[in-house]
């Protein structure tokens, strides 16, 4: 197994333009496919999740041109549903942002589609989405375990109707349903059961759908109405914002050991909820400066916080490791959906924090962290989870350094992460 040892680092300083958002990249690729007209996406993320989506679209006959650096993609829209005359099997790795939306989108046309992935994908639930699609007339069959991939879709189009979907597990289910609803044969009313997690991710979906000319009536996130007869129309160009979750590691580094760190590509005008990570850092005591398309973090004395993190579950992981550099206890609440991500992140985070000496209480949907008086060095397991690797890179600011096992797992969202981290710390 490959390991990366990070020697103790005293300071970080500089500026970084954050690669495109994974969430926006894959949503925009799918909407551009369903749209009428040609769409050029710029600042597209080049990472594993996006490559799985592009490979699947290519296999389905979607025509696109990708620049040499893979960050600019021009998509010839299909002007509606994707169909296939022969049975298709699509391999989607561990890319939830490809699996969930494609599962929904492929019910719209005609044909037989089988969706498979890595072993971890077979442990990531999709049952709530499939149940909702079945309520609208879709034929979906599980190939192994009920409620989980792999699965086969026998597509004949989606009817309209009323559909109930649980809101408390993953916002990706609702995102997938929202994106296909305008192309159903009749009006779709989506009713949310329970509290909706990760609302800001739904805002991203609604903003992009509006950019492609589709209207959704949002009744306070409890009910969504989507009228039939709508068509996605290419806006011509779509700029993919920098990934706000990826920005969180550099902002936290600035708060712990700046200097000052300026991230560009996200800011006050961002459609991503994860920019609110900077507010959480500010609550801890960090010096934060906002611009329309940048955020600057400077170091200050940090204190522990007790906070509901339901609105920023991905970026909240970064607070868990930043908490090691704060005075007092930190408690992150309402984060159950960490458990169904790339790995069970609640268990993984608790396990690895204990290795460096933290006292950790792992609850059903919360984590409570008391930093150690003196941190231990350790070899951190990353569980094939990009965010675990990036979060624990912050322990390079401890005076003992840190070792990251399987550092290349960052290829899921940020292949050049450790190179950029080294660049800013070297400049310091």
Swiss-Prot record:
Subunit (UniProt): Monomer.
Predominant localisation class: cytoplasm
Pfam families given in the database record: EPSP_synthase
Protein known as: 3-phosphoshikimate 1-carboxyvinyltransferase
Pathway connected to this protein: Metabolic intermediate biosynthesis; chorismate biosynthesis; chorismate from D-erythrose 4-phosphate and phosphoenolpyruvate: step 6/7
Record's keyword annotation contains Chloroplast: no
Organism: Shewanella denitrificans (strain OS217 / ATCC BAA-1090 / DSM 15013)
NCBIfam families, per database record: aroA
CDD domains: EPSP_synthase
Keywords: Amino-acid biosynthesis, Aromatic amino acid biosynthesis, Cytoplasm, Transferase
Localization per Swiss-Prot or TrEMBL: Cytoplasm
Reactions accelerated catalytically: 3-phosphoshikimate + phosphoenolpyruvate = 5-O-(1-carboxyvinyl)-3-phosphoshikimate + phosphate
Gene Ontology MF terms: 3-phosphoshikimate 1-carboxyvinyltransferase activity
Gene3D superfamilies, per the entry: Enolpyruvate transferase domain
Function noted in UniProt: Catalyzes the transfer of the enolpyruvyl moiety of phosphoenolpyruvate (PEP) to the 5-hydroxyl of shikimate-3-phosphate (S3P) to produce enolpyruvyl shikimate-3-phosphate and inorganic phosphate.
EC class name: transferase
GO CC terms, sorted: cytoplasm
EC number of the protein: 2.5.1.19
Family note: Belongs to the EPSP synthase family.
Binding site for phosphoenolpyruvate: 22, 96, 124, 172, 345, 387, 412
């Amino acid at each position: 197994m490959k390991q990366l040892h990070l020697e103790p680092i005293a300071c970080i300083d500089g500026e970084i333009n954050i690669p495109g958002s994974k969430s926006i990249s894959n949503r925009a690729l799918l909407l551009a496919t369903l749209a009428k007209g040609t769409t050029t996406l710029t600042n597209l993320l080049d990472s594993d999740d996006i490559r799985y989506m592009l490979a699947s679209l290519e296999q389905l006959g979607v025509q696109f041109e990708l620049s040499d650096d893979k960050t600019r993609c021009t998509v010839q829209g299909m002007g509606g549903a994707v169909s296939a005359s022969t049975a298709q099997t699509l391999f989607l790795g561990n890319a939830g942002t490809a699996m969930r939306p494609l599962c929904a989108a492929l019910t719209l046309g005609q044909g037989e589609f089988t969706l498979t992935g890595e072993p971890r994908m077979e442990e990531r639930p999709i049952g709530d989405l499939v149940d909702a699609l079945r309520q609208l007339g879709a034929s979906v069959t599980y190939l192994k375990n009920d409620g989980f991939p792999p699965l086969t879709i026998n597509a004949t189009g989606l009817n309209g109707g009323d559909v109930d979907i649980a809101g408390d597990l993953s916002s990706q289910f609702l995102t997938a349903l929202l994106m296909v609803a305008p192309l159903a044969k009749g009006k779709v009313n989506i009713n949310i059961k329970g509290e909706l997690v990760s609302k800001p991710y739904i805002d991203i979906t609604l903003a992009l759908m509006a950019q492609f000319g589709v209207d959704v009536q949002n009744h306070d996130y409890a009910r969504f109405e989507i009228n039939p007869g709508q068509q996605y129309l290419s806006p011509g160009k779509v700029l993919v914002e920098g990934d706000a979750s990826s920005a969180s590691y550099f902002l936290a580094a600035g708060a712990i050991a700046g200097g000052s760190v300026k991230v560009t590509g996200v800011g006050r005008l961002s459609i991503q909820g994860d920019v609110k990570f900077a507010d959480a850092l500010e609550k801890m005591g960090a010096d934060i400066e906002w611009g329309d398309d940048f955020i600057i973090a400077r170091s200050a004395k940090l204190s522990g916080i007790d906070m509901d993190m339901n609105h920023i579950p991905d970026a909240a992981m970064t607070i868990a490791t930043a908490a090691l550099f704060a005075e007092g206890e930190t408690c992150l609440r309402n984060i159950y959906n960490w458990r169904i991500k790339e790995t069970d992140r609640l268990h993984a985070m608790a396990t690895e924090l204990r290795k460096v000496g933290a006292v950790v209480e792992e609850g059903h949907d919360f984590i409570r962290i008391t930093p150690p008086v003196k941190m231990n060095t350790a070899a951190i397991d990353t569980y094939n989870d990009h965010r675990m690797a990036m979060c624990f890179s912050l322990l390079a600011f401890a005076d003992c350094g840190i070792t990251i096992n399987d550092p290349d797992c960052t290829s899921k969202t940020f292949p050049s992460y450790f190179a950029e981290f080294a660049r800013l710390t070297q400049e310091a």
